[in-house]
Swiss-Prot record:
Lineage: Bacteria, Pseudomonadati, Pseudomonadota, Gammaproteobacteria, Pseudomonadales
Residues at which L-ornithine binds: 168, 232, 236-237
Coiled coil: none
InterPro entries documented for this protein: Asp/Orn_carbamoyltranf_P-bd (IPR006132), Asp/Orn_carbamoylTrfase (IPR006130), Asp/Orn_carbamoylTrfase_sf (IPR036901), Asp_carbamoyltransf_Asp/Orn-bd (IPR006131), Orn/put_carbamltrans (IPR002292), OTCase_ArgI (IPR024904)
Location in the cell: Cytoplasm
Organism annotation: Pseudomonas putida (strain ATCC 47054 / DSM 6125 / CFBP 8728 / NCIMB 11950 / KT2440)
Protein name: Ornithine carbamoyltransferase, catabolic
Length: 336
């Protein structure tokens, strides 16, 4: 069956087929190789891309900007402090303005409904750079990274996600694994599992792709024999420091530490994290938490010994944000 990603939105990956996702992965690989060998060709000259950031960002902003510049496109960075978004102008009206000036729009912010409203009214492709519910651009980078660090085909790769699984990373890792036929394991307290409706949809995708989906409250059972262990921060951006107490109580058994990595029984297991990571107390937030919870001074969701070990491929993963976002831009906007 033919497919066409040109001028398509990227909002959650739900509307992308397995074949389309594999195409994005292959294009990411090819563009990465071209950048490394100095043979990259610019396909986006004359394109203008708006980057809306209602949440702060390091990797997503840098990845979009460098990817666009490499391909000859121009970008405009827009945040709440430098625009009328949400203050004097609705997202609906913002979409109708920006859609007349730009060839595409990236949005990083809060509710999924906001990026969907933006896509509905902009009239140009919209890319979800992160919402509370989904993180699709991160997923393409994560799977590319897993493929680079495994000699197995995708359908034989297994990975576990530990921690708050109802957040954008838990939802998205479940979704893309189900779409690509992978062995996906989610380990979290039942109260923090992905919502039932998403789980049911992913089970349907798994029936089509051959994926294996496991949800469990047992972290050691989840990681047994896996190729990759993923985690994320226990409190998401924008949540108050007061929320940490209950979350730490819930998630301490799901901390990725040396004991947990050993319990995989696989010496080749790699550790992945979308970053930023609280793996020590050298950050402002890490220091605040360590003062209240001294046993977390050497790491919250992941301990420093794991993060600084050869098993950690989080920085390769971070670099791949740029290559995969470039593939998304090129496949959507270029005439290939």
């Amino acid at each position: 069956m033919a497919f066409n990603i040109h001028n398509r939105n990227l909002l959650s990956l739900e509307h992308h087929t397995t074949r389309e996702l594999r195409y994005l992965l292959d294009l990411s690989r090819d563009l990465k190789r071209a950048k490394y060998t100095g043979t990259e060709q610019q396909h986006l000259k004359g394109n203008n891309i708006a980057l809306i950031f209602e949440k702060t960002s390091t990797r997503t902003r840098c990845a979009f900007e460098v990817a666009a510049y490499d391909q000859g496109a121009n970008v405009t960075y827009i945040d709440p402090n430098s625009s009328q978004i949400g203050h004097k102008e609705s997202m609906k009206d913002t979409a109708r303005v920006l859609g007349r000036m730009y060839d595409a729009i990236e949005y990083r912010g809060f509710k999924q409904e906001i990026v969907e409203e933006l896509a509905k009214f902009a009239g140009v492709p919209v890319f979800n750079g992160l919402t509370d519910e989904y993180h699709p651009t991160q997923m393409i980078a994560d799977v590319l990274t897993m493929r680079e660090h495994s000699d197995k085909p995708l359908h034989d790769i297994s990975y576990a996600y530990l921690g708050d699984a109802r957040n954008n990373m838990g939802n998205s890792l479940l979704l893309i694994g189900a779409k690509l036929g992978m062995d996906v394991r989610i380990a979290a307290p039942k109260a923090l599992w992905p919502h039932d409706d998403l789980v049911e949809r992913c089970k349907q995708y798994a029936e089509e792709s051959g994926a294996r989906i496991t949800l469990t409250e047992d972290p050691k059972a989840a990681v047994k024999g896996v190729d990759f262990v993923h985690t994320d921060v226990w409190v998401s951006m924008g949540e108050p420091i007061e929320a940490w107490g209950e979350r730490i109580k819930q998630l301490k058994p799901y901390q990725v530490n040396a004991e947990l990595m050993k319990s995989t029984g696989n010496p080749r297991t790699k550790f992945m994290h979308c970053l930023p990571a609280f793996h020590n107390s050298e950050t402002k937030v890490g220091k605040q938490i360590a003062e209240q919870y001294p046993d977390l001074a050497n790491g919250i969701e992941v301990t420093d010994d794991v993060f600084e070990s050869p098993a950690c491929i989080a920085f390769e993963q971070a670099e791949n944000r740029m290559h995969t976002i470039k593939a998304i831009l090129v496949s959507t906007l270029a005439d290939l």
